[in-house]
Swiss-Prot record:
Keywords: Calcium-activated potassium channel impairing toxin, Disulfide bond, Ion channel impairing toxin, Neurotoxin, Potassium channel impairing toxin, Pyrrolidone carboxylic acid, Secreted, Toxin. GO terms for cellular component: extracellular region. Has the structural arrangement of an alpha-helix connected to antiparallel beta-sheets by disulfide bonds (CS-alpha/beta). Disulfide bonds join C7-C28, C13-C33, C17-C35. This is Potassium channel toxin alpha-KTx 1.3. Blocks selectively the high conductance calcium-activated (maxi-K) potassium channels (KCa1.1/KCNMA1).
């Protein structure tokens, strides 16, 4: 899942992904958070 959340490192996305999608992991791609589903 792509998001509009800005990031610089993948760990910044983990709590974002948890809140948005209920998944614990994501990564930073192209300065935006992407969440695993």
């Amino acid at each position: 899942q792509f998001t509009d959340v800005d990031c610089s490192v993948s760990k910044e996305c983990w709590s974002v992904c948890k809140d948005l999608f209920g998944v614990d992991r994501g990564k930073c791609m192209g300065k935006k958070c992407r969440c695993y589903q």
